[in-house]
Amino acid sequence: MGTEGTGTSVPHKKDWRENMGIANRKILHTDILIIGGGTAGCYAALTVREHSDYSIIIAEKANIKRSGCLAAGVNAINAYIVKGRKPEDYVDYCRKDADGIVREDLLLSMSQGLNRVTDKLEKLGLVILKDENGEYVARGNRNIKINGENMKPLLAKAVEELDNCQILNRVNITDYIVENNQILGAFGFSIEDNTAYEIRAKKVLCATGGAAGLYRPNNPGFSRHKMWYPPFNTGAGYAMGINAGAEMTTFEMRFIALRCKDTIAPTGTIAQGVGAKQVNSLGEVYENKYGLTTSQRVYGTVRENIEGRGPCYLRTEGITPEQDDSLKRAYLNMAPSQTLKWLESGKNPSEQNVEIEGTEPYIVGGHTASGYWVDNDRESTIRGLFAAGDVAGGCPQKYVTGAMVEGEIAAIAMVKQLDEGYLDPELDEETAFDRKIEEYDHFLDTDEKMFTYEAIEEAMQKVMDNYAGGISTHYQFNEKQLELAKEKIEQLQKLVWHISAHDMHELMFVYEVKERLTVALSVIAHLKDRKETRWHSFAENLDYPEKSKEWEIFVNSKMVDGELKMIHRDLVNLCQVPAGNMACLSLIHI
């Protein structure tokens, strides 16, 4: 018989949670550690194995089969050199979209590899749509159509078949191990059991994605994760680099996506697929009035609403029945809530325009230029630490294929450096590891803790929304607001140490909040440092509403003795920086 109705309890589970601490420790050694098993990380592993037999460990806090931005798949390759175009054309497009604040050397090396990695994806099994002549079906000047729902599983399967490659799924990396500005590995913990990891590595690739959840999102409560960027990308790689003293760039170039209202579904499929224009409530096409760059499209929508001509829409009324069907099928594959919204309304896209809105701001180096300051090999200012994908700065508009190219470039560079020889520095493993385990145990000790990670996260998002240019302020800010934002975020950082985690999964949430707070402070510092408005909405500074030639520079930062030190660097033109040579990037002032 069972215990039903007897009033007995199962105390062992409660006791396990309340007394939980790190019980096991594992020290692993590898030649190359890849942190993040998303698009860039997986492709880097494939490239390392293609060029060497060096041992690889991939640490992924989810599971590489469906992790990262590519988890649900995509319906187009958005960065591709179509017939009649050349890599330099893509560089030119990216430079114009970012109003000049880009690393042209990084853009060129990325652009030159876009078609190469696409070809490899097709060989792995990706279905790329072709016309009657066997040519790829283009969507605009830089895109080709695919059936890409299974793109990530294809990459993951190829990685899982590699020899001498250990995949640590459900392991959350929290800190780099750095001595004398050289990377030695990383610390982390398992999300599924109370095990802490020290992973010693000769080379490390950070491929952890960008940062979502810094600002209050479009949808509240239970639906807060219905957002443009993966809510599980919390800026871990940025935060680890910031705390370790790596130089970062262009965090003031936030990214705000223009999306279908409420569903936060992509708008490009409608704009490019059926040629839909942006119109206001009066039916006026307004997109040309403000400009067609990514930030200007958002800004125009914001201004039309502020000036009383909202809501704003993508004009789909009057499209053909065939286009109706095409749109519903396309969204069913990648954003089914939009198709369901049409079905629930009882109206096809041809019968009603699609309302649009901007998302909350994100920090994502795959769309803007924010991230690690790297050389052409994608090596950061910490020796042996590389960055690829959304964490790598200076190179916007990467999308899937660009992230793969950066993973490839970094992988080849790591192999080359290892081929040239590696001297293993001394490190007091036990002492450093002990300190990190004590930190984990601090949060796992639930006695007398005052706050939850959710409360701190909500407070952070409110601060950023109100004082650092969120949705509620139409993405606008002034210096006084940024000063208040900094003060309040620093207060929240102190409160983090009063959060309790009841299990290892909650411990991951605690570190996600810590990461976001670290990134938020960098965003605030960068927004305050750039005394102009170069990108409307992305960085709308009300104290400096105009663009200034004086600010045609990179705004960088580095943590020195616990304080962010701002650094200004010259723009980098095509082929200006040789691989592996950071010294030639001139310093303007510190």
Where are these regions (language model features)?
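Extreme N-terminal leader/targeting segments of oxidoreductases
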Residues: 5-7, 11-32, 50-53, 586
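Mobile, glycine/GP-rich and aromatic-enriched active-site lid/loop segments adjacent to catalytic centers
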Residues: 115, 122-174, 182, 250-399, ...
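Core beta-strand elements of the Rossmann-like FAD/NAD(P) dinucleotide-binding domain
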Residues: 27-30, 193-203, 381
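Glycine-rich active-site loop/strand segments that organize a redox cofactor
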Residues: 78-110
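N-terminal Rossmann-like FAD-binding beta1-loop-alpha1 element of flavoenzymes
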Residues: 32-58
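Glycine-rich FAD pyrophosphate-binding loop
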Residues: 50-72
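Glycine-rich loop(s) and the adjacent beta-strand/alpha-helix scaffold that form part
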Residues: 206-265, 400-413
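Long, amphipathic alpha-helical stalk/connector segments used for oligomerization, subunit docking
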Residues: 419-503
